[in-house]
Amino acid sequence: MKNIAAYHFLRCCAIMGLSGVIAVRILCFGDSNTYGYDPRGFFGDRYGAKDRWVDLLSKQTGHECINAGANGREIPRNPYALPLLTEQQEVDIFLVMLGTNNLLQGATAKEVATSMEIFLTPLLPRCKQILLVAPPPMKRGAWVPTDELVAESICLAEEYKLLAEKLNIPFVDTRHWNIEPTFDGVHFTESGHHVFAEKLGKELHL
């Protein structure tokens, strides 16, 4: 199967008896790029719903996409400490896209993948379906001063791919999506959010 993420997603829908008529609930758990952070203001701001990928994906597909992004979030150490994750029985897909802030704090791609494995493993029996998404690679900018940091962000996708295979969960690789970052090299531009939503929807065949 060429598109593994789409295969797992559609298989999940079939198992749960879901179809295009019934909306699927997708919890999008991530950092500031899921939240929709706009770094252009002095204290930062948030893009409007029409320019955030979670809201765009919901409008594009007709499915309920819940924005559970938070600025500065790293991979949680203890999933049971998060009230949001104790209600997974009400969510059909748990989409997680984290790791960028771990890299910015000095972790390597391998270390980030290890943290993600520790986070996801206890969630496996509690979630109907987990979808692991590799964050788009960073680019040189105000927050990304070295090529080494860019390289680690590129390597993260490969580490996540291996992890997804190990955990037998679907994986989406965004390395070649060319998501446009702002001046800081990290956060999506408004157009970047639109491209991300479009490509993710196609990846999942939504």
Residue ranges and their predicted role:
Residues I4-A5, C13, L18-A70, L82-E90, ...:
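Serine-esterase "nucleophile elbow" of acetyl-processing enzymes
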Residues D51-D55, Q60, Y80-L206:
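Alpha-helical cap/lid subdomain in secreted, periplasmic
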Residues R73:
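Internal alpha/beta domain cores that form substrate/cofactor-binding pockets in large enzymes
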